[in-house]
Design a protein with these regions (language model features):
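Conserved PLP-enzyme active-site core in the AAT-like
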Residues: 1-204
């Protein structure tokens, strides 16, 4: 049965007072010693700022698990096996990271494969988010969209280019709609002012 309004309000307040963002990392894990600090899974090609970010958040650099690459793209088999290991060991995962345009090579991680891995893991009880670091290559996604925002087919996009896009690039762009958050810096490929960079999130409450 639904709680009376007064009890519901009290319960919500109690929940809020136990949240990580209210207590802080140290107090939260002191109170809940049975819990483990979550991992962040990212490709070995990820920008060095990921290491910095985990330090600043207080999660710790050791929670950043760098996964191997295949052809300078995240190896999805390695991701799947890492997620399975985390599930078996009851190790929480905060997010898997895809890079859309690596700093050194401009390669796109298989976002579609990473999203599929998230869905399979979630079905087994290991829920986590997928974040796309599209700081470098995100602006290129505009080439793949019609004016109304709908996705253009690979053949439509390819008409304007000689050998672009590869099927895996189109699949990665198409899968952006299924991710949880994206960072983008249009001042790079878009030649726009630096202040146009953004962090976008599917859940607008964030």
């Amino acid at each position: 049965a639904a709680q009376p309004l007064r009890e519901r309000k009290t319960w919500r307040q109690r929940v809020q007072q136990e949240r990580l963002e209210y207590l802080g990392m140290l107090e939260f894990f002191t109170r809940h010693a049975q819990l483990r600090v979550p991992h962040v899974l990212a490709p070995v090609t990820a920008h060095y700022s990921w290491s910095k970010g985990l330090k600043l958040l207080g999660l710790g650099r050791s929670q950043l698990q760098l996964l191997p690459e295949q052809g300078m793209r995240l190896d999805t088999d390695a991701l799947e096996s890492t997620l399975e290991k985390c599930r078996r060991e009851r190790q929480p995962v905060l997010m898997s990271v895809a890079v859309l345009g690596t700093t050194e090579y401009g390669t796109f991680d298989p976002v579609d494969g990473i999203v599929a891995a998230r869905e399979r893991a979630a079905a087994l009880g290991l829920g986590h988010s997928v974040h796309v670091d599209a700081a470098w290559g995100g602006y290129l996604a505009t080439v793949f969209r019609n004016e109304d925002g709908s996705l253009r087919s690979r053949d439509e996009v390819a008409r304007g280019y000689h050998a672009f896009p590869a099927p895996e690039v189109h699949a990665a762009i198409a899968a952006l709609a299924d991710t949880d958050s994206i960072t983008i810096d249009p001042h790079k490929l878009g030649h726009l002012p630096s202040g146009t960079g953004a962090f976008t999130r599917r859940d607008h409450r964030v």
